[in-house]
């Protein structure tokens, strides 16, 4: 597998565009991804009991059609908690886009992100849609889906399947309300592989638990967010089938793209200065390892310690202890940046200057060794700063 300098439109047969329609005052806020032919599609959606109208529309269409031609997205207005009118507006958003592309409405996915409780300004949407073009600027799409993010989040890779080259690309947004299960973000992945929707869903479902569901910024789960994958077969490879070496290769490709997007989201948490990675190793099973890792990275006390560049092993061990996992914790090793701070559940002395250098970096890795098995799990998050409170205190409702 090779990482390339690409966009969401790098896979064959895809294009994208983004622009400023007026959902936000100045920044880009409207865009689409278009496949030149019907693409296999798979999705995972928020687990919040309050589900935004666009998710209802998209989830229904994915289940009904099993194929997709385009995804249209606005940012600035979430169209969540907007009742019957909000649902009607989401369907209208889908229908207008379908009319413009000359396809059936169920072939269109819709997504919205932004302020909850506001109806979509439909004149703004209609005006923006009239200006979107096929084969537009894919980098502008990556900008158009952002809310409080400080940077775009994209990744693109290629892999060979026999004599054919398959390209996969991803783009995401997410900065606050990040505690997916699956939730709190928008992620879109395009691919030109020949793979059915059912097989694509299998690959997505298998990998979401190890990637997007292992990030946390603030523990809040959004009403709006989802991950959609489209694969249109333009690479002309032999169909990828389950339980084959080709499926395993495709799954690893998808896992890499999803993991890179997840890390970019965690690193861009609201007010964040540092990316935190927690590796739990030698656990009795992978699920326990992932639960412990997410417990540590989600701890507000651990987050604030990392912000203050304090190697507070006590907070880390406490988060391990309340993770809800029945694993002995009387023989735990904890390393920060590879430097031991606890061995066999007892603190050890360490070089203060070496630790200071580790804690001062913009990425901090915490390793928890349980000595209870051979499985591992990883989670990602960010530190918790003064700016997080400031950003969310000033955010408009």
UniProtKB/Swiss-Prot annotation:
One of its GO terms (biological process) is ornithine biosynthetic process. One of its GO terms (molecular function) is glutamate N-acetyltransferase activity. One of its GO terms (cellular component) is cytoplasm. Pfam families: ArgJ. It is found in: Cytoplasm. The record marks 113-114 as: Involved in the stabilization of negative charge on the oxyanion by the formation of the oxyanion hole. Its EC number is 2.3.1.35, 2.3.1.1. The record marks 183-184 as: Cleavage. Its main location: cytoplasm. Substrate binds at residues 147, 173, 184, 270, 392, 397. The active site is at residue 184. InterPro entries: Arg_biosynth_ArgJ, ArgJ-like_dom_sf, ArgJ_beta_C. Catalyzes two activities which are involved in the cyclic version of arginine biosynthesis: the synthesis of N-acetylglutamate from glutamate and acetyl-CoA as the acetyl donor, and of ornithine by transacetylation between N(2)-acetylornithine and glutamate. Belongs to the ArgJ family. This is Arginine biosynthesis bifunctional protein ArgJ. It comes from Streptococcus thermophilus (strain ATCC BAA-250 / LMG 18311). The lineage of its organism: Bacteria, Bacillati, Bacillota, Bacilli, Lactobacillales.
């Amino acid at each position: 597998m090779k990482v390339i300098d690409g966009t969401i439109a790098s896979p064959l047969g895809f294009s994208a565009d983004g622009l400023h329609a007026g959902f936000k005052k100045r920044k880009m806020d409207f865009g689409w991804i278009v496949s030149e032919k019907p693409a296999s599609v798979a999705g995972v959606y928020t687990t919040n009991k309050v589900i935004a109208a666009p998710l209802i529309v998209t989830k229904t269409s994915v289940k009904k059609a099993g194929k997709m031609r385009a995804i249209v997205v606005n940012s600035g207005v979430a169209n969540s908690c907007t009742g019957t009118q909000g649902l009607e507006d989401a369907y209208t958003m889908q229908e207008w886009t379908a009319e413009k592309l000359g396809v059936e409405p169920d072939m269109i996915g819709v997504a919205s992100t932004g302020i909850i409780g506001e109806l979509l300004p439909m004149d703004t949407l209609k005006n923006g849609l009239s200006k979107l073009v096929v084969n537009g600027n894919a980098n502008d799409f990556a900008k158009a889906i952002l809310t409080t993010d400080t940077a775009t989040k994209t990744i693109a890779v290629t892999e060979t399947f026999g004599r054919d080259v398959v390209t996969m690309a991803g783009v995401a947004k997410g900065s606050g309300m990040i505690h997916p299960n699956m939730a709190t973000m928008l992620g879109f992945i395009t691919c030109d592989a020949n793979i059915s929707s059912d097989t694509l869903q299998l690959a997505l479902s298998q990998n979401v638990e190890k990637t997007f569901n292992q990030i946390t910024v603030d523990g809040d789960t959004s009403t709006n967010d989802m991950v959609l994958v489209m694969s249109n077969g333009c690479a002309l490879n032999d169909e990828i089938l389950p339980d084959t070496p080709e499926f395993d290769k495709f799954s690893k490709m998808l896992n890499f793209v999803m993991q890179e997007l997840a890390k970019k989201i965690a690193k861009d948490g609201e007010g964040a200065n540092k990316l935190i990675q927690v590796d739990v190793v030698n656990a009795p099973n992978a699920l326990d390892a992932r639960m412990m890792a997410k417990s540590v990275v989600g701890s507000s006390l651990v987050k604030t310690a990392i912000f203050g560049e304090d190697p507070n092993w006590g907070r880390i061990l406490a988060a391990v202890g309340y993770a809800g996992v029945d694993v002995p914790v009387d023989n735990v090793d904890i390393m920060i940046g590879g430097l031991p701070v606890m061995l066999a559940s007892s603190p050890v002395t360490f070089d203060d200057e070496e630790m200071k250098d580790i804690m001062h970096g913009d990425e901090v890795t915490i390793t928890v060794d349980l000595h209870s098995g051979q499985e591992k799990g990883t989670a990602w998050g960010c530190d918790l700063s003064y700016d997080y409170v400031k950003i969310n205190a000033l955010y408009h409702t």
